Swiss-Prot record:
Keywords: Cell cycle, Cell division, Cyclin. It comes from the Eukaryota. CDD domains: CYCLIN_AtCycC_rpt1, CYCLIN_AtCycC_rpt2. The keyword Cell division applies. It holds the Pfam family Cyclin_N. SUPFAM superfamilies: Cyclin-like (SSF47954). This is Cyclin-C1-2. Belongs to the cyclin family. Cyclin C subfamily.
């Protein structure tokens, strides 16, 4: 698993933390702040999840789609790449990449159900046109390694057989896609951070197991703090603030 990751395009595409929330000049001209940028990406991550729930797409595909979407916006502007089209297009592309094909017609049907605004009632041709733009923005790198891959092995290896802790850890991993962690850190470190949080919350002493892993626990704890900070600040991510951010995109500079 590790050797595959270290030689993969995913590893080569990892960013420094300060790179992932750089506001594109075209967006900055419209008054988009770093906080607006984060809000829009979070909103579109949630939108991808809602679409997937309607279509009954598995979580791994959702995770890949969110990763694609977040990667796109490390290179392209929100202004030129309309998020409400990019997000479902990334889901469509992720379905192909993860061999869980969904017809564009079905995707468009649920897009129209979730977005009543006529301005964003996209058709199949819009998805197909944006698909090529997204592929180019991704440099055609579609491989994504997820924290899910190492999670069962780590849970078993640590001796954790507590069902509630297992469920908590899986939930934490799911929530990491509401942040940019997958663009910054190797996925197995994200997995370990989630296990660390769950072990502290459930008062499970697996300190010795962590020590035997020979990983930098400072990095693991820093990732854990990022996750906890997200939960702490999540109440500030209101729909009103999301709408205000999107309204800025709609204005001319």
């Amino acid at each position: 698993m590790a050797s595959n990751f270290w030689t993969s395009t995913h590893y080569k595409e990892l960013k420094d933390p300060e790179e992932v929330n750089v506001v594109h000049p075209l967006d900055a001209q419209r008054g988009i702040s770093v906080e607006d940028f984060r809000l829009i990406k979070l909103h579109m991550s949630n939108y991808i999840s809602k679409l997937a729930q309607h279509i009954k797409i598995r979580q791994r595909v959702v995770a890949t789609a969110v990763t694609y979407m977040r990667r796109v916006y490390t290179r392209k502007s929100l202004t030129e790449y309309e998020p409400r089209l990019v997000a479902p297009t990334c889901l469509y592309l992720a379905c192909k990449a993860e061999e869980s094909v969904v017809h564009a017609k079905l995707l468009v049907f649920y897009m129209k159900k979730l977005y009543a605004d006529e301005k964003f009632r996209y058709e199949i041709k819009d998805i197909l046109e944006m698909e090529m733009k997204v592929l180019e923005a991704l440099n055609f790198y579609l491989v994504v390694f997820h924290p899910y891959r190492s999670l069962p092995e780590f849970l078993q290896d640590s001796g954790i057989n507590d069902t509630s802790m297992t469920h908590l850890t899986w939930g934490l991993v799911n929530d990491t896609y509401r942040m940019d962690l997958i663009l910054i850190h190797p996925p197995f470190l994200i997995t370990l951070a989630c296990i660390y949080i769950a072990s502290v919350h459930k008062e499970k002493d697996i300190k010795t197991w962590f020590e035997e892993l020979s990983v930098d626990m400072n990095i693991v704890k820093n990732i854990a703090m990022e996750i906890l900070d997200f939960y702490e600040n999540h109440r500030l991510f209101t729909e009103e603030r999301v709408h205000a951010a999107f309204n800025k995109l709609a204005t001319n500079p």
